[in-house]
Structures are given as C-alpha cells and as structure tokens.
C-alpha cells in the first residue's frame, strides 16, 4: 500500500513539474505533452483542462476527448511535416497547442499564432471541410509576424484592382466565408477580402494545400497569379530551399 501511494505521489509531482515547465516556456496553463518525438522537432501539447490567457484574459480554449485528439493529431502532424526543422527554426515555431472551442473576445477562431512564444494554438474542432488548409493559413501568420518587411501590405494591396479596399481588421468584416470562389477575380475566398494579411494567408494556404486549384486559377486570373508569385518569392527569401 505504501509503495502504491509513493508511485501515485511521484506521478502527481511529475505531472505538476511537467505542467509548470510548459507554462514557464509558453505561458499557457493546464497543458500536457501529447507528442515531442517528431521528425521536425515540433512539440505537440494538449489542454488537459480549459485555459484562459491574454492580456485581458480574452482568449479561451477547452480540453478535448482523447479520440478527437488522436484523430486530429494525425491530420495536423501530416500537414506540419511539410515544414522541416530548419524552416520552423527560421520562422520561430516550436510548440503546437491542441484544444477546442478556441475563441478570442468571444469570437470563435481556427487558430491563434504567437510568434514571440514560438506557439500556434489550433482548434481541433474547427470546420472539418477546410481544416487542413486552415493549418497552413495559421502558419503563414507566424511567418508574417516574423518577416513583415517581406510581406508589405501596401505593396500587396497594389496588386488588387484600384477600386478595391480591405477592411480595417478581420473581425470588422462580415467576409468570413472559406469556400473557394467559382469566379475568383483576384481572391480565392470571401475571407481573402477582409484584410491584406488574411488575403496573404489565404493565398499561401492554397499554394501549400491545393496546388491544382492554384495552377488552374492563376492561368485565368492575372491578379491571383501576381499574388502567388509574390508569396513564393518572399518565402524563398526566408528559405531558398523551401519546397512548395
């Protein structure tokens, strides 16, 4: 009986120390390790309990059932394995946090990137139809946050028709659709029209996850062709060996 108690106590303290270590690294509570033995050295963590973070405690996410974690982890890892360790180091991404019902200021969101903390939080229950593409959309925000000089929004905006204007912020707009347009006219999705940075992220996510659509549409849409070339050219400035 004493031995059993000692084992239980040791497991408790190990879990506590592990949780404290993770918190000290990325400042998110209630996380545990899901997988750290990965080919590109990404560390996958999951929410053991709900957590609230942010300067105004305005970011919330909830824990998931194991079967959901296991299912979505396979999808997420397969997509993030497209990035090698060297590229991830350059863009400053190391930790992937898995949870569900992720929101910021009460608005549900697919992911929250934090370039400074090398972290990307992913809502594993977000729209299953677009889930894989959204992963790369959020990765682009990490890239963009670290290389603003390459992804200049004024230069990007000039690629559009002269009469087009983005909104002030992504949440200021009702343009939230992620379905791919049948007629593009410079944009892959409705959400692309919200802000310049979201447009870039949408273009990047299509380049990585849907090469056939990109090739087909850029042959017919000169604006989209320029946007795709802009993204590719500047990604290669970060890593000349990057494979699209």
Task: Set out the residue ranges of the language-model regions.
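Active-site-flanking segments in enzyme catalytic domains
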Residues: 92-244
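Auxiliary, metal-adjacent structural segments of Zn-dependent hydrolase domains
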Residues: 53-115
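Non-catalytic architectural context of zinc metalloproteases
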Residues: 20-70, 98-101, 168-181, 197-199, ...
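An N-terminal domain-start capping segment
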Residues: 20-23, 80-83, 153
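Classical Sec-dependent N-terminal signal peptides that target proteins to the secretory pathway
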Residues: 1-20
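Hydrophobic, Leu/Ile/Phe/Ala-enriched alpha-helical segments that form helix-helix packing faces
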Residues: 12, 76-87, 143, 208, ...
